Amino acid sequence: MSGRGRPRVVGTAGHIDHGKTALVHALTGIRTDRLPEERRRGISIDLGFAPLDLGPDAPPASVVDVPGHEGFVRNMVAGATGIDAVLFTVAADEGFMPQSREHLIVLEALGVRNGVVAVTKADLVSPEWSRLVVETVSEELADSGLASAEIVVVSATLGTGLERLRQALTAVLAALPVRPLDFPFRMPVDRSFQVAGAGTVVTGTVWSGTVSEGETVCVLPAGLEARVRSLEVHGRPVDRAEAGTRAAVALAGPGAGGARRGVTLVGVDRPWSASRRVDARLWLSGSAPRPLESGDRVRVHHGTSEVMARLRWYGDGAVAPGETGEALLLLERPLVPAVGDRLVIRAYSPVTTIGGGSVLARRPPRTRGSRRSDRGRLLERLADTSGQERVTAVLGAAGARGVEEPGLSLDTGIGAAQLAAISLEEDVEAHGGRWFERAVREDAMRRIAESVAHHHETHPLETGQPLSIARKAVRDADSALVEAAIHALIEDGALERRGAGLAVVGRELDLDPEDARLLERLERRYREAGLEAPETDDVAGDLAVDGSHLRGLLRYLEREGRLVKLASDWYADAGAVGRARDLLVARLARDGAADTGACKEALGVSRKYLIPVLEYLDRSGVTRREGNRRILAGGDS
């Protein structure tokens, strides 16, 4: 990167034959009308590119020269997307023209509010006429984002005004905020061609992040990967291209074949995804011929892509010219958006630019009825907020699921550095690589604490609630949030771990006299039975005890180490099982292996009682079954 600052991209705009290409040539020395047809017809058809050196005090820059002909507005939009500032041209001999106005609408839609206006071809008119044109241009721009832009009268042929134009551009570019490098890499492709020895080469403006030689990128929406063989910035080989640069990327691999204008290069380890559904705040130009209604088909320009979409307003069924609204765009082909991305909206037929907007959500949920109304209100809130308020709104909508850390940048339009600063605030926090509202974690704590307390009341013989059950107290929650809530409850002294469960701190078992007597009878019953333990339902009938209550007593004796659970509903005396284990281990140590008959002989029980004991010893890692034989676990057969 140059010591003069981060790279910038300037785009031209203006009516056909208003001197855009000639002015770029005068500023850069490069002819951007590269196509034979462009030079034959004397007009720009596709995009042209050149380095823009404005002097030692200016940041490094590139210029994108766009066509002015009404038939090539889609190419103009593809070039204007991603620019930092505009060089808007109006010919002195013609003044403001229809494509001047349409290009101005496109710039408004893209949020381009910085630039310089050049009144070109001053050599063709008198100075008095040039002054009149400047006044007219100023009036035309009065209600636009370029209202305060400096207007410079120039002649590319004579060179007059060019130095002042360079100074004006330098001032504009120097005052612009830098594009963050901590936002995930993304580069919409505007050209693709084959180069001998290099293979597929694509060009574009790096919208965000960085890309390096040798790195693997993903070509979206196809999802195929490609390796960056080499990088160039204006014909110079570089190791890395960063946000704000015009880059040529040589690709190799499966994704290279599908890399063409309209696709997007992203980093493979980043959370970018293609989507056919986008929520957006849209505005309709005051010059639009009619209201835009729900169900209308429109052309959506995003990056270098143009896709057809069906529009659904969240509020009223139509938006009148000059008004705004929140809408769902159902795209016929996927885009690769981030929140805050700009959109240009053009009519289906006749094809004219009618408005624009910005992305509010890149993967909106499907909603109906009241939930759709709630969604509309959330989008209004998102559209009118930024920074921490937007983060809070997004996390509030995500609830206990949270948002993955890299994806939060794309869902809010905020880079990693600003997110890190926001994480220091009190109302948001990160756990396990995901972000949550603090209130969501506090609600999870409350639900888990209530669940554990309720378990104590309904299972008085258990020392605590199993963790697997406690975790289910927070429905549809990310596991990282649940673990953070449990950790906080333990740190606060509200809960404690007991074995594989959670218990309220200070809560002890308080056996009533009847349960104490039942436990004594149960322990004696199982001790006397040895391995020939009774089935649980039989015990419940013999002792006239409710089955659920009996199972609670049995689990208590198991936790105390007095019983062993052999099967799902079968317990045996722990001492008897221990003696059986010792007998079988001694037999296997002597003989190496024993079939079922030998095991039955060693333990002196029928097959009914033998098999549960053998399976328990297998699960416990004492023995291992091989066919019909048992061997010691870890031993050789």
Segment roles from a protein language model:
Residues D17, L23, G42, D65, ...:
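Residue-level signature of catalytic and energy-coupling elements of molecular machines
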Residues H69-E70, A92-M97, V112, K121-S126, ...:
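Conserved nucleotide-binding/hydrolysis micro-motifs of P-loop NTPases
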Residues M1-V66:
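Conserved G1/Walker A P-loop phosphate-binding module
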Residues P59-P60, V66-G71, A80-L132, V539:
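Conserved Switch II/interswitch segment of TRAFAC-class P-loop GTPases
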Residues A91-A92, V116-L132, V152-T160, L165, ...:
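G-domain G4 guanine-recognition motif of GTPases
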Residues S2, A122, E139-A288:
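Conserved catalytic-core segments of large NTP-driven translation/proteostasis enzymes
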Residues T12, V125-S130, T136-E139, P254-K565, ...:
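C-terminal effector modules of nucleic-acid-centric enzymes and ribosome-associated factors
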